[in-house]
Amino acid sequence: MKSLPVIDKARILRTPEDRFAHIADFPYVAKYVEIGGLRIAYIDEGPREAAPILLMHGEPTWSYLYRKMIPGLLAAGHRVIAPDLVGFGRSDKPSAKEDFSYANHVAWMVGWMEAVDIQNATLFCQDWGSLIGLRMVTHSPDRFARVVLANGGLPTGTQGVVPKAFKIWRAFARFSPWFPIGRIVNSGCAQ
């Protein structure tokens, strides 16, 4: 695995806390760990002695994605831990495009996992969270008891051809002057 990147504080953006103050259905207080100069936010709810369920969100969301799942998991007696990936939600956002590599995201989240000391976890991951979360499992399999994968996978890099649909999405995300993030997230949610 790549060594932990350290980001210059002058190149870090941070969303003000008051932007999260009145969000419906998400009463959870964020905790923070600093990894490589970045503040990574996460929620940690439920009994400390319970084996955790680690919820890894996809792109372009944050831990808020799981707001409908968290109450049920807590009611069942589980501990729930849900980080905001770097660049999303309450976590810091590097301002330099070159800092946003897949290797950096994996290194940051492995560092976070070690700092929070995730043990005996059930990983629930989807979308971009699966690409990072499954690498966390391969890095430290002894920290995980179970894996639940939704809408994701772990490409080996040997497929040779990037799917056309992904190329179209990447071009849209990179070059579109109009990026309706709310509509994009909403279109992937049950109504």
Model-derived segments and spans:
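Short hydrophobic signal-anchor/transmembrane segments that target glycosyltransferases
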Residues: 72-74
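Short acidic-hydrophobic surface loop/beta-edge motif
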Residues: 31-35
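Flexible "cap/lid" subdomain of the alpha/beta-hydrolase fold that forms the substrate-access gate
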Residues: 2-28, 38-40, 45-52, 65, ...
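Structural cue for short, hydrophobic secondary-structure segments
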Residues: 55-58, 82
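The serine-hydrolase catalytic nucleophile loop
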Residues: 59-70
